[in-house]
């Protein structure tokens, strides 16, 4: 049976209840072995997408303002999912790394990508799949353009021995390892290349 790649957007992964629906869809068909996940989207009218909150953190840090209040809101969004699904995932080291990044040398693409990164870790834990960082497989040229040849090679080498995986959408890595994002909606691109 050929593996199927499925991609779920932000509204599909905004809450624990949505995670449960996504898991049911994936478990319906054993061929659905690879999942590309977005950052949590809006939970209700008037809510803010996690990616937009991450951009606010970046903007605050660059303006010399304290990003902690917005980062606390992001942390709580993920904690709500962890608690409701009873996951034994500790995202605190990830948030510590994000805070350090904001203090030292904020990079917009790195910040924007953390929603996909963290949500994919949670979804992988919930499904019992392996988490594979997109920065290991989705590659860009030095000029920031997508490198399909290097990406296809990296995906082949990485996923050949992994039965089931969750991969964050929206970003990959530059030749120097720096995180680089696609434009908004780039998780769809990740889904198509995986």
Tell what function each PLM region has.
Residues 1-194:
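Nucleotide/pyrophosphate-binding catalytic subdomain
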């Amino acid at each position: 049976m050929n593996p199927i790649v499925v991609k779920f957007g932000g509204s599909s992964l905004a809450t624990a209840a949505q995670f449960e629906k996504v898991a049911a869809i994936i478990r319906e068909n054993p061929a659905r072995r690879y999942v590309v996940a977005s950052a949590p989207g809006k939970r209700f009218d008037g809510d803010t997408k996690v990616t937009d909150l991450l951009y606010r953190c970046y903007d605050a840090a660059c303006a010399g303002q304290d990003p902690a209040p917005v980062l606390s809101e992001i942390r709580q969004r993920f904690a709500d999912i962890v608690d409701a699904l009873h996951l034994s995932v500790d995202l605190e080291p990830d948030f510590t790394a994000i805070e350090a990044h904001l203090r030292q040398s904020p990079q917009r693409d790195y910040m924007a990508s953390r929603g996909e990164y963290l949500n994919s870790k949670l979804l992988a834990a919930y499904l019992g799949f392996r988490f594979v960082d997109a920065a290991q497989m989705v590659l860009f040229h030095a000029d920031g353009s997508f490198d399909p040849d290097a990406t296809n090679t990296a995906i082949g080498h990485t996923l050949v021995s992994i039965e089931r995986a969750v991969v964050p959408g929206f970003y990959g890595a530059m030749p120097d390892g720096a995180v680089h994002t696609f434009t908004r909606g780039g998780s769809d691109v990740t889904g198509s290349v995986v």
